[in-house]
Regions:
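Short C-terminal tail/terminal secondary-structure segment
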Residues: 2-5, 95-98, 149, 237-250
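Canonical Rossmann dinucleotide-binding motif of NAD(H)/NADP(H)-dependent dehydrogenases/reductases
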Residues: 4-36
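C-terminal substrate-recognition "lid" of short-chain dehydrogenase/reductases
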Residues: 82, 124, 132, 136, ...
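Substrate-binding pocket helix/loop in short-chain dehydrogenase/reductase
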Residues: 99-101, 108-110, 195, 206
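Active-site helix of classical SDR
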Residues: 124, 160, 168
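Alpha-helical segment proximal to the catalytic Tyr-Lys
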Residues: 129, 173-177, 234
């Protein structure tokens, strides 16, 4: 992977203890950034931060992104560790169970919305004022190809990720005058812990939709995100970057 220069930049990665979030955090560290990992799993996020500490300056914060007060407290903790927040990666999310919409448990629907889109809103609402004050920022929201196309048996997940795309487009326009770039990625499925929440039938459905014939590698997602966070991305904002292996070509 090409090296991206993020020296002297500070970054927050939600859901940074594992999966795509971990790969992003690791590449940002390797690129010179100081990184704060936000995750609801206290044990795992602390273990991950310890493991990454040899690569650079990294901290762990336990946070529930679906709770606005928890996010506000996370910002307070993070600002004690590093000066400001230049980069925000909204990656935390869950897939939820696979079921037809008419059979979908309302409590699971609400939980998915609370984490996948309300969590993004809470982080954006809390962090963007810091970036506005500094007249600089790079925000990348992690959506999904499901948010563009909709996956059967995953209406809640698909709807929540479509909302992430929409909030990216709106906020990109709102922050364009503040030297803040807001973009999102729409990855196809990658082999991460989120697969544990899915039926094998659904996993095979997703694989069968990818013309490349394989799942996304988390390092491939991290590479695109790192570029979006860099000074090289000086113009593009409010955009959707596809990582679906040819499934979605718009």
């Amino acid at each position: 992977m090409n090296q991206i220069d993020l020296k002297n930049k500070t970054a927050v990665v939600t859901g940074g203890a594992q999966g795509i979030g971990l790969a992003i955090a690791e590449l940002l560290l390797n690129s010179g950034a100081t990184v704060s990992l936000w995750d609801q799993d206290q044990k795992l996020v602390n273990e991950t931060a310890n493991r990454l500490s040899s690569k650079g300056k990294v901290d762990a914060v336990t946070v529930d992104v679906s709770d606005l007060d928890s996010v506000k407290n996370a910002v307070i903790q993070t600002k004690k560790f590093m000066d400001g927040i230049d980069i925000l990666i909204c990656n935390a999310g869950i897939s939820g169970p696979n079921a037809k919409l008419w059979d979908y448990p309302p409590e699971d629907w609400q939980k998915i919305m609370n984490i996948n889109i309300n969590g993004v809103f809470n982080c954006l609402r809390t962090v963007t004022p810091i970036m506005i004050e500094n007249n600089y920022g790079r925000i990348v929201n992690v959506s999904s190809v499901a948010g563009k196309e909709g996956n059967p048996g995953a209406s809640a997940y698909s709807a929540s990720k479509a909302a992430v795309i929409a909030i990216t487009k709106s906020l990109g326009k709102e922050l364009a005058d503040y030297n803040i770039a807001v973009n999102c990625i729409t990855p196809a499925a990658a082999k991460t812990q989120i697969f544990n929440q899915m039926k094998e039938e659904h996993i095979q459905y997703m694989l069968g939709k990818i013309p490349r014939g394989r799942f996304l590698k988390v390092e491939e997602a991290a590479s695109m995100v790192a570029w979006l966070c860099s000074e090289e991305n000086s113009f593009t904002t409010g955009s959707v970057f596809d990582l679906s292996g040819g499934r979605s070509t718009y």
